[in-house]
């Protein structure tokens, strides 16, 4: 059986990864990166970009922000705003002049919204890039698997890397709850991957 991922190498964060990225991008300024990341409340939203930007040359990386908003203002909007402020600061500091956003409203029909998001991502012009980095740190599992599948299925002949920022001290406090224990929120679609409440945060994946 042929595995599509057999030629991929998985590296965890150690000095080897930092050295690899520095050597690979600093010595190959002709390489052009499109960096996809999710827009959300998760404090890890900008960790990956903050990690990558010092290792590439100015103008070597563009960004595509994936947003999956609700039509109503969420109670965690302040956290999203803080993340966006930091993201814009990174754009300015590292001269990321080309950055765009793909946005689909997930507050109504989840399956329809997911298909629409896949279509928008598939139509994005990846032609000028040699490397595609997908940062799934702030993207719900129910969404990022489809994004990865969509881009991989385009058979672009590009290097595609998947990055995730993990925080063990944060993740250890996440406990699985049976759906019967969840309190419904009027107007909130249970299948969507965003948080439904703060303190504690309930996330449907």
Give the positions of each predicted feature:
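Residue(s) in the substrate-gating loop at a strand-loop-helix junction
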Residues: 134
């Amino acid at each position: 059986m042929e595995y599509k991922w057999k030629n991929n190498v998985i590296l965890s964060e150690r000095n080897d990864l930092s050295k690899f990225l520095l050597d690979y991008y600093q010595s190959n300024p002709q390489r052009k990166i499109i960096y996809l990341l999710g827009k959300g409340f998760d404090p890890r939203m900008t960790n990956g970009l903050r990690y990558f930007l010092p290792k590439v040359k100015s103008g070597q990386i563009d960004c595509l922000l994936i947003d999956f908003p609700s039509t109503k203002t969420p109670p965690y909007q302040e956290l999203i705003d803080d993340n966006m402020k930091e993201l814009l600061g990174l754009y300015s500091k590292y001269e990321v002049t080309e950055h765009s956003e793909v946005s689909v409203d997930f507050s109504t029909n989840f399956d329809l919204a997911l298909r629409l998001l896949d279509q928008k991502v598939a139509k994005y012009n990846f032609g000028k890039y040699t490397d595609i980095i997908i940062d799934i740190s702030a993207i719900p599992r129910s969404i990022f698997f489809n994004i990865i599948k969509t881009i991989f299925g385009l058979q672009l002949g590009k290097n595609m890397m998947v990055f995730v920022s993990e925080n063990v001290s944060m993740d250890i406090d996440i406990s699985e709850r049976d759906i019967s224990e969840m309190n419904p929120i009027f107007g909130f679609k249970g299948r969507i991957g965003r948080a439904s409440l703060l303190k504690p945060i309930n996330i449907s994946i």
